[in-house]
Amino acid sequence: MALTKAEMAEHLFETLGINKRVAKEMVESFFEEIRGALESGEQVKLSGFGNFDLRDKNQRPGRNPKTGEDIPISARRVVTFRPGQKLKTRVEASNAGK
């Protein structure tokens, strides 16, 4: 099961008592800020959670799995996420009891 933006908005509604429309807008705004920063080439650091980084990948050789034909995989920029130590610790602790 995955946590969705709708569930995040519902949690804000229940916890903070704000109306559902405002809660949904807050969640959307949060993610739009992250998207905008990454589109501008900025790193996103969320203290206690982790970092979103941009990484440039060079062109490399690849292969079409159906035909076996060699094809180039074009250069691109990708987003990576590195969890912070607090997040790692909490995930490991919650997984230890299972």
Curated annotation (Swiss-Prot):
Residues 49-71 are annotated as: Disordered. Coiled coil: none annotated. InterPro entries: Hist_DNA-bd (IPR000119), Histone-like_DNA-bd_CS (IPR020816), IHF-like_DNA-bd_dom_sf (IPR010992), IHF_alpha (IPR005684). GO terms for molecular function: DNA binding; structural constituent of chromatin. GO terms for biological process: DNA recombination; positive regulation of metabolic process; regulation of DNA-templated transcription; regulation of translation. GO terms for cellular component: cytosol. PANTHER family: DNA-BINDING PROTEIN HU (PTHR33175), INTEGRATION HOST FACTOR SUBUNIT ALPHA (PTHR33175:SF2). Belongs to the bacterial histone-like protein family. This is Integration host factor subunit alpha. It comes from Shewanella sp. (strain MR-4).
